[in-house]
From Swiss-Prot:
This is L-arabinose isomerase. Its cofactor is Mn(2+). It comes from Escherichia coli (strain 55989 / EAEC). Pathway: Carbohydrate degradation; L-arabinose degradation via L-ribulose; D-xylulose 5-phosphate from L-arabinose (bacterial route): step 1/3. Binds 1 Mn(2+) ion per subunit. The gene is araA. One of its GO terms (biological process) is L-arabinose catabolic process to xylulose 5-phosphate. It catalyses: beta-L-arabinopyranose = L-ribulose. Disulfide bonds: none annotated.
C-alpha cells in the first residue's frame, strides 16, 4: 500500500442537453469505457472515479463543491466530449480548490472516412469543446494542466500519471506538519524564512519542539527494542569491526538505534512527516542523529539539517511525488568542487544525513567515526556512493514577496577514485551546462546550499510542481546561458512585482 491508495481522481465529462438523450447515453458509455481502460491499462498511480455527466451549471457546481469537501479526492480530470458551453463552468471553477487537468482527447483515434456524418461530428467535439473550456480557464486566470492525446496513447498515460503524482502531493502537503528540533543554525540566512507565508502558500505547518522533549522519548525506549533494531542493522548493512559485537564503538550503535526509535515515536505521535535538527541544539542527546535521520528519510520522511524547514518540507513533497518510481530522493548539499578542464565536478554530501534510497551499494557500510562539529559522542552513519545517471537538485527559497524554486539538471557520475578517509555518504556529479555557468546562475538566483537531490524525478515534474503551487521556477540546464538567465531574473522581478 502506498500514499496513492488513500486518494482518487475524479473523471468529469462535460456536455449539454442540446444533443438529446441518445447522444448523452453514448457519451456516458464512452466515458465508462475510457475510465475502465485507463484504470486497468495505463499504470496510473491513482484510481480514476467516473462522476455523473456535467450538463448544467448546477450539476457542474455540485461536482466541484463535492470535490472540495471530499478528502479522498486529489483532483479533477475533465474531458469535454461534446461542446460544453463554458459559462456553465464558471461557478464551479470559481469555488474549486483541487488541482484540475483537462484531458483533450476523443473516443475514436481515426476518423471513419467513409461513414462520418453530422451525428458523429456532434458526438465527438473535443477539438472545439476543449477550446471553449480553455478560454474560460484563461479568462478566469485559473491555472490548470492540459494533456492532449488519444486515451490509449502511452505518452498521454505517462503525463496524466505524472500530474496525478503532483495532485496527490499537493493534498498531502496541506496536511504536512514539519517538526523542528531546536532552531536554525545561528546567523544562517537562507534556512530562515516566513513560516506563516509558507503555510498560506503551500499548506504545511512548521513548529519547534525543544530537544529536551525528544530526549524524554528517546530515554523511554526499552533495551529490548534497541537490540531488535540493531539486529536489523546487522542484516541490512555491512558493519565495520568497530561497530560489531565487542567492537569499540558498539555502544555508539546502540545509542544511535535508541535515537532512531525515539525520533520515530515522537514523529508518529505528533503526526509529523518532516523534521529538522541542528548540531547547535543537541542538549541531552549523546550524538548528532545521523543513522536515524538516514533511515527515516528512506521511510519517506522529509529532513534537512540546521533547522532548514523549507528543504525538509520540499524533500517530503518530492518523496511523495516519487513514490513507486525508480531511483531515490535525498537531502543533499553542494560540498566541494573538483576543478579540471572539461571535467569539473561537484561532490555533494552532508555531515551525515544522506538518504540510502540513492545508494548504489546493496548493503551500505555502517560505521562510527569522529565528528568534530556538535561536541558530542562519535555518531553512527551509513556510508555509500550514489547511483549514476541523470538527476536534479532543487532548492526552495523565500524571497520575501514570493517563493522561488531553483532546479539544476545534473549528471551523476562514478567516483573515479576511492575515498578511504571520507566517512560520509556522497554523490558526485557534473552540473549542466557546466560548473561555472551552473554555479554562477545558482548564486545569482539566490539558491540555497541545501538541496533535494533526486534520480526519480525530472525537470518536468518540478515545473508541474511550480505551476500547481503558483510559484516562480528558475531552471539551470544545458540550454542555460548567463545573459539570458540574468534577463529572466529581471523580468520575473517585474512580473511578480505587478502581482503583489
Amino acid at each position: 500500500m502506498t500514499i496513492f491508495d488513500n486518494y482518487e481522481v475524479w473523471f468529469v465529462i462535460g456536455s449539454q442537453h442540446l444533443y438529446g438523450p441518445e447522444t448523452l447515453r453514448q457519451v456516458t458509455q464512452h466515458a465508462e469505457h475510457v475510465v475502465n481502460a485507463l484504470n486497468t491499462e495505463a499504470k496510473l498511480p491513482c484510481k480514476l472515479v467516473l462522476k455523473p455527466l456535467g450538463t448544467t451549471p448546477d450539476e457542474i457546481t455540485a461536482i466541484c463543491r463535492d470535490a472540495n469537501y471530499d478528502d479522498r479526492c486529489a483532483g479533477l480530470v475533465v474531458w469535454l466530449h461534446t461542446f460544453s458551453p463554458a459559462k456553465m463552468w464558471i461557478n464551479g471553477l470559481t469555488m474549486l480548490n483541487k488541482p484540475l487537468l483537462q484531458f483533450h482527447t476523443q473516443f475514436n483515434a481515426a476518423l471513419p472516412w467513409d461513414s462520418i456524418d453530422m451525428d458523429f461530428m456532434n458526438l465527438n467535439q473535443t477539438a472545439h469543446g476543449g477550446r471553449e473550456f480553455g478560454f474560460i480557464g484563461a479568462r478566469m486566470r485559473q491555472q490548470h494542466a492540459v494533456v492532449t492525446g488519444h486515451w490509449q496513447d502511452k505518452q498521454a498515460h505517462e503525463r496524466i500519471g505524472s500530474w496525478m503524482r503532483q495532485a496527490v502531493s499537493k493534498q498531502d502537503t496541506r496536511h504536512l506538519k514539519v517538526c523542528r528540533f531546536g532552531d536554525n543554525m545561528r546567523e544562517v540566512a537562507v534556512t530562515d524564512g516566513d513560516k506563516v507565508a509558507a503555510q498560506i502558500k503551500f499548506g504545511f505547518s512548521v513548529n519547534t519542539w525543544a530537544v529536551g522533549d525528544l530526549v524524554q522519548v528517546v530515554n523511554s525506549i526499552s533495551d529490548g527494542d534497541v537490540n531488535a533494531l540493531v539486529d536489523e542493522y546487522e542484516s541490512c548493512y555491512t558493519m565495520t569491526p568497530a561497530t560489531q559485537i565487542h567492537g569499540e564503538k558498539r555502544q555508539n550503535v546502540l545509542e544511535a538505534a535508541r535515537i532512531e526509535l525515539g525520533m520515530k515515536r515522537f514523529l508518529e505521535q505528533g503526526g509529523f512527516h518532516a523534521f529538522t535538527t541542528t548540531f547547535e541544539d543537541l542538549h541531552g542527546l549523546k550524538q548528532l542523529p545521523g543513522l536515524a535521520v538516514q533511515r527515516l528519510m528512506q521511510q519517506g520522511y522529509g529532513f534537512a539539517g540546521e533547522g532548514d524547514w523549507k528543504t525538509a518540507a520540499l524533500l517530503r513533497i518530492m518523496k511523495v511525488m516519487s513514490t513507486g518510481l525508480q531511483g531515490g530522493t535525498s537531502f543533499m548539499e553542494d560540498y566541494t568542487y573538483h576543478f579540471e578542464k572539461g571535467n569539473d565536478l561537484v561532490l555533494g554530501s552532508h555531515m551525515l544525513e544522506v538518504c540510502p534510497s540513492i545508494a548504489v551499494e546493496e548493503k551500505p557500510i555502517l560505521d562510527v567515526q569522529h565528528l568534530g562539529i556538535g561536541g558530542k559522542d562519535d555518531p553512527a552513519r551509513l556510508i555509500f556512493n550514489t547511483q549514476t545517471g541523470p538527476a536534479i537538485v532543487a532548492s526552495l527559497i523565500d524571497l520575501g514577496d514570493r517563493y522561488r524554486l531553483l532546479v539544476n539538471c545534473i549528471d551523476t557520475v562514478k567516483t573515479p577514485h576511492s575515498l578511504p578517509k571520507l566517512p560520509v555518504a556522497n554523490a558526485l556529479w557534473k552540473a549542466q551546462p557546466d560548473l561555472p555557468t551552473a554555479s554562477e546562475a545558482w548564486i545569482l538566483a539566490g539558491g540555497a546550499h541545501h538541496t533535494v537531490f533526486s534520480h526519480a524525478l525530472n525537470l518536468n515534474d518540478m515545473c508541474q510542481f511550480a505551476e500547481m503551487h503558483d510559484i516562480e521556477i528558475t531552471v539551470i540546464d544545458n540550454d542555460t546561458r548567463l545573459p539570458a538567465f540574468k534577463d529572466a531574473l529581471r523580468w520575473n522581478e517585474v512580473y511578480y512585482g505587478f502581482r503583489r
